[in-house]
UniProtKB/Swiss-Prot annotation:
InterPro entries: Ub_conjugating_enzyme, UBQ-conjugat_E2_core, UBQ-conjugating_AS, UBQ-conjugating_enzyme/RWD
Residues recorded as bearing N-acetylthreonine in the entry: T2
Keywords assigned by UniProt, alphabetized: Acetylation, ATP-binding, Nucleotide-binding, Transferase, Ubl conjugation, Ubl conjugation pathway
Occurrences of domain UBC core (ranges): 5-166
UniProt organism field: Macaca fascicularis (Crab-eating macaque)
Post-translational modifications: Autoubiquitinated.
Keyword Ubl conjugation appears in the UniProt entry: yes
Active site (catalytic residues): C90
Positions bearing N-acetylmethionine: M1
Name of protein: Ubiquitin-conjugating enzyme E2 G1
Pathway: Protein modification; protein ubiquitination
Record gene name: UBE2G1
Organism ancestry: Eukaryota, Metazoa, Chordata, Craniata, Vertebrata
Top EC class of this enzyme: transferase
GO term, biological process aspect, one: protein K63-linked ubiquitination
Length: 170
């Protein structure tokens, strides 16, 4: 896939999301002149600890998208087993295609060129509702989620939700 084809695909996906918004998130370009860097706002899913949160993240697409997955990084602080302390999201759908050298993921769960920004965001929203404790990016958050979900983990998430509400539209 050429860079031009990649850019056209990203432009089409952005136009589709603006024309037919998907519940739970919105997306736009960080810079109108750069189709490869997007900003997304994710609304914490109802009936989860993240409910009411407004979390800002960036998606950075490779020039050969969709052959390779984008990278996603939360800009808003978030306490979650599958988000490392730098904000980088670690879920299967964002991992390079092919075999997992550690044997945790099946190839069909990893990146496939048929995925879109919409499928990525639906996966991230699902991740917020149901963390994967077996493959954590934040070991401390995963430990708290397993051992003290309604105690320390819940308090840290609540603090992140409050902070996200205060800084959502800065």
């Amino acid at each position: 896939m050429t860079e031009l084809q990649s850019a056209l695909l990203l432009r089409r996906q952005l136009a589709e999301l603006n024309k037919n918004p998907v519940e739970g998130f919105s997306a736009g370009l960080i810079d109108d002149n750069d189709l490869y860097r997007w900003e997304v706002l994710i609304i914490g899913p109802p009936d989860t600890l993240y409910e009411g949160g407004v979390f800002k993240a960036h998606l950075t697409f490779p020039k050969d998208y969709p052959l390779r997955p984008p990278k996603m990084k939360f800009i808003t602080e978030i306490w979650h087993p599958n988000v490392d302390k730098n904000g980088d999201v670690c879920i299967s759908i964002l991992h390079e295609p092919g075999e997992d050298k550690y044997g945790y993921e099946k190839p069909e769960g990893r990146w496939l060129p048929i995925h879109t920004v919409e499928t990525i965001m639906i996966s991230v929203i699902s991740m917020l509702a149901d963390p994967n404790g077996d493959s954590p990016a934040n070991v401390d958050a995963a430990k708290e989620w397993r051992e003290d979900r309604n105690g320390e983990f819940k308090r840290k998430v609540a603090r992140c939700v409050r902070k996200s509400q205060e800084t959502a539209f800065e």
